[in-house]
A protein has these predicted regions:
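Single conserved hydrophobic/aromatic residue that forms the stacking wall/gate
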Residues: 1-12
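Conserved ABC ATPase "signature" region
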Residues: 41, 45, 52-70, 122
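Conserved signature/switch motifs of ABC ATPase nucleotide-binding domains
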Residues: 73-76, 94
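Catalytic "switch" loops of ABC-type ATPases
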Residues: 26-31, 137
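Short coil-to-helix segment of the ABC ATPase nucleotide-binding domain corresponding to the Q-loop/switch region
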Residues: 34-41
């Protein structure tokens, strides 16, 4: 429902004020001088929530991402994967319907990345949030998605939209299944179609 008399900037500003979406960056972007619970609670402070409601939401989201008991730690006291989970908790804290994630696991080693992929799927099942996840990893895209939008580089355009019929319950070994590999090949073909090497 967009008011055509207003510019898109006004629409985006309204969405920001209404907290229509949460955003998770490539790097955790945690403030070093704030504890994890104060980092997670920052958007709630900005929104003007009461101390009681803020504490409840922070505790709930830290528990949701598996960081219960780490709220009083500082970012430097956590591993890279734990810092990224704190960043996800911060994005979830104000209860937006849409979570935008820009390569949040790109800098992590493969084992930690696999673990966070499993946790993100579980988080999605628990919350029902819409998650838009940007990645350059074909296996990660196929594992996490029920819809994959394949894009070309410069200029960015959609080369394919793939509806995944993988089951909602996805153990890591699903990546060895024929269905998974077929979807991954279709993603690869879409990427290849969008690239020019001339």
């Amino acid at each position: 429902d967009v008011d055509r008399s207003r510019g898109l900037g006004d629409v985006y500003k309204r969405q920001r004020l209404e907290r229509a979406y949460g955003y998770v960056f490539q790097a955790p972007a945690l403030l070093a001088w704030r504890t994890i619970e104060r980092n997670v609670g920052l958007p709630l402070e900005i929104m003007g929530l009461s101390a009681v409601e803020k504490a409840e939401r922070v505790a709930r989201t830290l528990d949701l991402v598996g960081l219960d008991g780490f709220g009083r730690k500082f970012p430097w006291q956590l591993s890279g994967g734990m810092q990224q989970r704190a960043s996800i908790a911060r994005a979830l804290a104000f209860d937006a319907d849409l979570l935008l994630m820009d390569e949040p696991f790109g800098a992590l080693d493969e084992i930690v990345r696999d673990h966070l992929n499993e946790q993100l799927l579980e988080l999605w099942r628990k919350t029902g949030k819409t998650i838009c996840f940007v990645t350059h990893s074909i296996p990660e895209a196929v594992y996490l998605s029920n819809k994959i939008v394949v894009m070309s580089p410069r200029p960015g355009r959609v080369t394919d939209i793939i509806e995944s019929d993988l089951p909602t319950d996805r153990p890591l070994d699903i990546r060895e299944s024929k269905k998974f590999l077929d979807i991954a090949q279709r993603v690869r073909n879409g990427l290849r179609d969008g690239h020019s090497y001339e």
